[in-house]
């Protein structure tokens, strides 16, 4: 990391009024260089170093004026300094994976900035569960991971066969995946792993080999997620890949289920878990709650549907008064989740005496191969809703928006949809309980805009 980047990551972004930081003269824009002579790299490193010295510490500051300060602080262990550093600067991935989503973005269209970032950052892996390939870790990175016990980490494997993995990643540098994983594990780091499954490339015997080689690291390798490849309509100049269809999904479920049963018999856990999309595409039942353990992979699309179904049933049986004001509205989602959401919206209608209609939005922005709700655009939602809008309001997936303005990835907002459709529009929340509240609170605020 460059000196400039490191300095940016240690700049103070926020000072809490009345805090220790304010009392000792720290200011926004000051740069934290060291804690007790130990150099600081970023916000995560800063928090770790503070934990080493809970009572007495000296912070070396580079003031905005250019002065160097050494600030001595005595505090109680539970006392917070009351400052925040700048966000961690993302390390960029130098792989060129044949299925990389960033390479498949539509050219010449508005795209949310974060979608254009190819991150490969062990800090984001630890903090947010982002997957990394381990191809850009330096010796310094390894030592920091060991020292700070940054565990678990999330590793994109895709294939354990070196030649196949090299082809998938399109990276000419030496890889040593299994050796690096072994090193992490021997130093106390636990791992979650994933394979993005591509028909006729890393499936079949290659998939079996990957599963068995990763299983050798269990329980230090906690899980393996198997996720279907996502292909947009914008793959000009990229390798030709086959998408996952219903027939392939059925075949994969049959193949992996057999392996899961064998592993569960020998290890007490299925170990490898298929993404929900496989079951939906194949028209198969979602596995029971017991299949997923404590649901460690929901953010990777594994067990999310089972969570939704179970939570929906819990909410549905909660005692509620019948609405005084008729509730009529439209709920939109992506094509893949539509049959499930529609089924449970119908149950909600019957039980709560309300009138909601669920509609599926096709993704014209990325193409029909991308069918998840989180990647819907405002324009596509409008195009579908203007023809099928029912009732007094529209509820859209919260995961398709970001920020206080509720911005879709094509820079449309909820306000834009309201303007064009003539009805209130809001997000349905990230939990089933939030979804129920966002609907039922309309009883008391039918003509207001209520964003969850």
Tell where the protein language model's regions lie, with residue ranges:
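Conserved PDZ fold ligand-binding element
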Residues: 23-41
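PDZ-domain C-terminal substructure recognizer with occasional recognition of PDZ-binding tails
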Residues: 47-84
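Terminal peptide-recognition signature
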Residues: 21, 29-32, 46, 59, ...
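Flexible glycine/acidic-rich beta-alpha junction loops that bind and position SAM and/or redox cofactors
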Residues: 200-201, 221-247, 266-290, 363-368, ...
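Structural preference for beta-strand elements that scaffold enzyme active sites
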Residues: 152-154, 190-192, 223-225, 271-273, ...
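Radical SAM enzyme core and accessory elements
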Residues: 1-7, 11-12, 283-452
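Conserved Radical SAM active-site core
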Residues: 67-68, 75-220, 230-259
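Short alpha-helix capping/helix-loop boundary micro-motifs
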Residues: 16-21, 42-44
């Amino acid at each position: 990391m460059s000196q400039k980047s490191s300095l940016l990551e240690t700049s103070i972004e926020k000072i809490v009024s009345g805090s220790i930081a304010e009392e000792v003269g720290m200011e926004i824009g000051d740069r934290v260089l060291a804690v007790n002579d130990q150099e600081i790299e970023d916000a995560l490193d800063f928090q770790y170093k503070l934990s080493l010295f809970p009572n007495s510490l000296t912070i070396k500051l580079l003031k905005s004026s250019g002065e160097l300060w050494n600030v001595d602080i005595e505090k109680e262990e539970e006392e917070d300094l009351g400052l925040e550093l700048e966000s961690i600067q993302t390390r960029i991935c130098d792989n060129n994976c044949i299925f990389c989503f960033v390479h498949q973005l539509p050219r010449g269209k508005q795209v949310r900035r974060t979608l254009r970032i190819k991150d490969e950052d062990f800090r984001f892996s630890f903090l947010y569960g982002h997957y990394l390939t381990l191809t850009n870790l330096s010796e310094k990175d390894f030592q920091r991971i060991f020292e700070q016990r940054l565990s678990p980490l999330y590793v994109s494997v895709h294939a354990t066969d070196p030649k196949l993995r090299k082809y998938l990643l399109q990276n000419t540098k030496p890889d040593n995946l299994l050796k690096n994983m072994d090193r992490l594990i021997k130093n106390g780091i636990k791992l979650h792993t994933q394979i993005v499954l591509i028909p006729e490339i890393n499936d079949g015997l290659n998939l079996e080999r990957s599963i068995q080689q990763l299983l050798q690291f269990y329980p230090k390798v906690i899980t393996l997620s198997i996720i279907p490849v996502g292909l947009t309509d914008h793959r000009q100049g990229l390798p030709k890949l086959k998408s996952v269809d219903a027939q392939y999904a059925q075949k994969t479920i049959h193949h992996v289920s057999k392996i899961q049963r064998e592993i569960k018999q020998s290890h007490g856990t299925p170990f490898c878990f298929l993404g929900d999309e496989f079951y939906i595409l194949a028209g198969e039942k979602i596995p029971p709650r017991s299949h997923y353990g404590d649901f460690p992979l929901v953010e990777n699309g594994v067990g999310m549907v089972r969570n939704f179904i179970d939570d929906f049933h819990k909410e549905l049986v909660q005692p509620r008064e019948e609405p005084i004001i008729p509730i009529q509205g439209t709920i939109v989602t992506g094509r893949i989740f539509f049959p499930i959401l529609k089924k449970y919206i119908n149950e909600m209608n019957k039980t709560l005496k309300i009138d909601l209609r669920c509609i599926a939005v096709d993704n014209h922005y990325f193409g029909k191969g991308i069918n998840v709700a989180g990647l819907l655009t405002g324009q596509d939602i409008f195009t579908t809703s203007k023809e099928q809008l029912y009732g007094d309001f529209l509820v859209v997936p919260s995961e398709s928006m970001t920020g206080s303005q509720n911005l879709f990835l094509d820079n449309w907002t909820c306000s834009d949809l309201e303007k064009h459709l003539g009805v209130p529009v809001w997000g349905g929340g990230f939990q089933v309980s939030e979804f129920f509240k966002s609907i039922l609170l309309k009883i008391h605020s039918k003509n207001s805009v209520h964003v969850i």
